[in-house]
């Protein structure tokens, strides 16, 4: 789990796909606040990620918890695009087969631009950031 988590972070931060991260026939089910998309290959999953997050970013916080068939991966990420800093928080349910990711179900908060982050910071004090 830890090795796959590290490989996944590398992919999320750089867009580079470490060897052995995804099965060629990996299934993606991505849910965003107002949309849902799916992909049925590593090539399509990678294209979907790069379309939504084309540049490098940083995973600023993450956690992985094992399940009987894989693990749950929670993370926060930040990146710069369109002249501003963006933020998203996501939860992934990952199914692993033969040491590689076979299925990835993603729930995303959506991409928060600078204005949304400022609005949230002014309105809400998080107990556990």
Labelled PLM ranges:
Residues 10, 14, 30-32, 94, ...:
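Generic detector of low-complexity/intrinsically disordered segments
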Residues 47-129:
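A beta-strand edge to alpha-helix "cap/lid" segment located at domain peripheries
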Residues 17-68:
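A solvent-exposed, acidic/Ser-Thr-rich amphipathic alpha-helical stretch
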Residues 1-25:
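Short acidic-aromatic low-complexity motifs
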Residues 6-9, 18-19, 43-47, 121-124:
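Generic detector of well-ordered alpha-helical segments enriched in charged/polar residues
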């Amino acid at each position: 789990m830890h090795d796959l988590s590290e490989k996944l972070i590398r992919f999320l931060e750089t867009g580079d796909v470490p060897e052995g991260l995804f099965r060629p026939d990996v299934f993606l089910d991505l849910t965003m606040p107002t949309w849902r998309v799916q992909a049925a290959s590593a090539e399509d999953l990678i294209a979907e990620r790069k379309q939504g997050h084309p540049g490098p970013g940083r995973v600023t916080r993450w956690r992985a918890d094992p399940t009987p068939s894989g693990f749950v991966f929670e993370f926060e990420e930040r990146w710069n695009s369109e002249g501003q800093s963006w933020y998203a928080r996501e939860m992934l349910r990952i199914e692993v087969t033969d040491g590689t990711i076979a299925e990835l179900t993603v729930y995303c908060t959506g991409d928060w631009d600078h204005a949304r982050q400022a609005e949230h910071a002014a309105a809400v004090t998080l107990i556990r950031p």
